[in-house]
């Protein structure tokens, strides 16, 4: 038996072998665009699975998917060993189907520690009736206020889920300021009596983030902002807007459910430190 992890073009032809509920949309999208991060898992030169490897300085993200006809034969374990040899980072983050207990235990048995999970949700309804709120496009002079409210809101969320014990507030920087300015056309702020109380951004079909200033939460502003931003995506021609909700973020999940967003799939993340 010779399991190898190799580059191969046109991996999208293997998409019919992939279970969407297991792999999730992102892996399939990477296969469709023939991403540089996609590799074939081969057995004696025959493709028996695929893997996604994004090896960055702060951690390597991987997904391993063995086609069903080749499972329960030890090929997944051998493939994971080969993938780990390729990783240069000191930490590996394995992505798996959160509701797939077999996949979770497969990783745990090999030294990975499940840390957190996130659910992709999709909306396929009509435009919302939105309360009278003041929303405008983000401007550079908004940076300090918008950054501070978004950073604190997400820090509180991370701590609240119990999945991010090392979460800390970030500091504003010129680098992040320029990055925000670069994508200003996709960023929006909500104002109340001249004060910035909300920030949101979109990317393609996705409502990427929505955050409300801590002092103004639990007043219905978040729900109204989500309605407004969903409508913006629909106005851009997006037929089914999507968003992600961290598992354990109970308040946000309740809002999304009440608005008609439906769970599509849920991905889990498991970490392992390497010896490098």
PLM segments and residue spans:
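A short beta-loop-alpha structural element at the N-terminal edge
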Residues: 1-14, 134-159
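Conserved GNAT-fold acetyl-CoA-binding loop/helix
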Residues: 8-31, 155-177
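Conserved donor-binding loop and adjoining core beta-sheet/short helix segment
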Residues: 25-78, 197-208
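A structural microfeature
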Residues: 49, 116-117, 198, 222, ...
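Conserved hydrophobic beta-strand within the GNAT/NAT acetyltransferase core sheet
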Residues: 62, 92-97, 207, 241-245
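Acyl-donor-binding surface of acyltransferase catalytic domains
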Residues: 71-133, 270-271
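Conserved acetyl-CoA-binding loop-helix of GNAT-fold acetyltransferases
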Residues: 72-86, 212, 218-232, 254, ...
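C-terminal "cap" of GNAT-fold acetyltransferases
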Residues: 116-141, 242-250, 262, 266-276
């Amino acid at each position: 038996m010779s399991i190898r992890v190799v580059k191969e073009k046109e991996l999208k032809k293997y998409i019919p072998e992939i279970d969407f509920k297991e792999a999730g949309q992102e892996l399939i999208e990477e296969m469709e665009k023939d991403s540089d991060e996609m590799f074939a898992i081969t057995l004696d030169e025959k493709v028996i699975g695929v893997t996604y490897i994004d090896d960055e300085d702060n951690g390597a993200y991987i997904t391993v998917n063995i086609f069903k006809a080749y499972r329960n034969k030890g090929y997944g374990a051998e493939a994971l060993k080969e993938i780990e040899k390729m990783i240069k980072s000191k930490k590996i983050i394995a992505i798996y189907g959160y509701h797939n207990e077999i996949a979770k235990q497969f990783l745990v048995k090999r030294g990975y520690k499940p840390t957190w999970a996130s659910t992709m949700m999709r909306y396929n309804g009509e435009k919302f009736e939105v309360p009278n709120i003041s929303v405008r496009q983000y401007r550079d002079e908004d940076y300090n206020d918008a950054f501070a409210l978004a950073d604190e809101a997400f820090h509180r969320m991370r701590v609240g889920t119990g999945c991010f014990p090392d979460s800390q507030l970030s500091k504003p920087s010129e680098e992040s300021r320029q990055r925000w300015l670069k994508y200003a056309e996709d960023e929006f702020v909500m104002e109340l009596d001249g004060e910035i109380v909300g920030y949101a951004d979109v990317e393609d079909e996705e409502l990427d983030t929505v955050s409300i200033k801590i002092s103004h939460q639990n007043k219905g502003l978040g729900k109204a902002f989500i309605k407004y931003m969903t409508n913006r995506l629909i106005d851009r021609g997006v037929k089914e807007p999507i968003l992600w909700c961290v598992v354990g973020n109970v308040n946000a999940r309740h809002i999304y459910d009440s608005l008609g967003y439906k769970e599509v799939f849920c991905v889990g993340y498991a970490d392992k430190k390497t010896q490098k």
